[in-house]
Amino acid sequence: MSEIQARAAGASVQPPLSQAVGYVIVVVLGLIIAGADKAVMMVITKILKKTTGEDNKKTEMFMTANRTVRTGLTASAVISSWLWTTAMLGASFVGYDYGVAGPFWFAAGCSPMIVFFALIGISYKRKIPDAHTSLEVVRIRYGRIAHAVFMTLCLINNIFACANMLLGAAAVISAITGMHIIAATFLLPVGVTVYTFVGGIKATFLTDYFHTAIILIIACYLSVKAFTFEEVGSIGKLYELVQAAAQRHPVSGNQDGTYLTMTSKGAILFGILHICSNFGLVIMDTSYFIKAFSAAPSSVVPGYTIGGIAYFAIPWALGTIMSSLALGLENTASFPTYPRRMTSTEVSNGLVLPYAAMTIAGKGGAAAVLLITFMAVTSTLSAQVIAVSSILSFDVYREYINRAASDRDIIRASHFGVIFFAAFSAGFSTMLHYVGIDLGWTLYMLGVVTCPGIFPMAFTILWRRQSRAAAILSPILGMATGIGVWLGTAQHFYGAVSVSSTGQILPCVYGTVASAFSPIVYSVLITLVKPQRYDWAEFRKEKLGLERLDSDSDITVNGQGSEEQQNRTSFDPQELKRWGRIAAFWSIATFLGHWVLWPLPMYGSKYVFGKGFFTAWVIVGIIWLWITMLVAIFYPLLDGGMQQMLQISRALRGRREAVTSTSLPSVNNDSPEVFRVNEKS
């Protein structure tokens, strides 16, 4: 029996799958995927090196994919970056707690800042196109003290983000298979470490693509399977089941106690907390900057905009359907916890989704949730791991240990960072588990520690007047303010500072808002004392490029020079400025649409869903979810994927022709089918 079930009050739920299945998925499948990724990446790397000049032994390729990732793959990677286990497990459990408003506010707390990041990303492309991490930019503008402050904030962000993922995923795997939760916590990062170690950021893009495809296919399957289950049968019947659930146990703070309304005090408080927390997770997560740096300049804005809007459907549709199933069916014999309701421990551990899937699809549903949990945590964890490895290699090793570091040195440091952080995150998550902290606690309090650097970091690239002192002090003061408010309100409302009280919604909302917005006040006031006016041209004076290894090859495709060299000269300032205006428009439009114009009138009207409106609500969500699947799977193939495969095929044919003609006295270098490889002597 798993530890999660043992801790739950009432009758325990027997895991539907054996421990052997858990170990096969977590260990064997993880290593198979890692091995397959390694083999595929080795083949792809070798082919791309010969045909397009992409060499994963170069840091520019390992860390930024030569800054040439196109819109389709960028959009897919953005969807994958937010496709955390928390997105599926958390959206379902807030739906169980608050009704239909919960999953909506979960989704609305994600999409606006994903799109907003397009504005940040294009600003970096305009002002410092050769950057590898956001922390490099902080160091150049404000110096080493600020660099150390923001490096600490980013590492805190990554540590808590990984803990949030691992706590939820390990709890679900334990509940489904009976596998020990600590074993799951330590074994999940193993496969991630292997394929990230080998492939760098390109591996995370490609692996994310395949993992996201599998997750979305299963999510779409569950969205349809729900209505083929005999006790549900239709959306209208599901409406009746949820309505009956509200009569059995009405929701405090919801209009008429129903689950079928957007007028939910708890849900809107969660929405405020979630959007602030997620702004912190995005701005302070260097993996988002790495993917923005990796994208071609013309792909940043459309990639992040399409990805952000498409992503909205995943927590909204899946969370609404699965939480409604759990609410409607938990008083039936088919539900795993029958005859009791789910306990608060089970809900907070994210077990709403797996229990609902087990109800409608039996062991197949359990296996499906086990698979998507594994895929989601390994995919998103890989981005976190490479983000931290980039900090340790560029911002620690290259800056403070070996300023003359070569490509080989930095790749070695990156490899060390991958291994170190994977082990550390597993150990930190284990510590949290043993002090009684779970997915729900980390989901609620995350913003307290991730938000203090939001505005000082954004001002670094958007506001030339922020002073060095303001950049250094405002996030520190913001962190202190947020933690003080968080703990103080926990004491005020619940009479004690404990794991239980600090994980409640009100202290976390107050603490998160204080952490997010107090640094604005601190930054402006400190800047007014001694204002500065930074010259953006200073960014370009910093040498961020890396010396090439003596063994590097000069690869020329069609006589045009390396793709990296072409790319570095392809930044058109006017074009980037135009993309900046487009990014600003879509950022505002997405926030207004998803957070203001759609939900707030419904909240204020105190409207309770009728059967017809609920049916339309669910249908729109399902259609949106299926469109997201099509965008994530097929858009990368249509947007350059097939073209690159054809390019590689032509180049390989050209190489074979060049090899067969080596006896000729000369080679026609103008032929589009011929390329040259000139090794340095």
What is the role of each PLM region?
Residues 1-681:
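Membrane-embedded helix-loop-helix hairpins and adjacent transmembrane boundary segments
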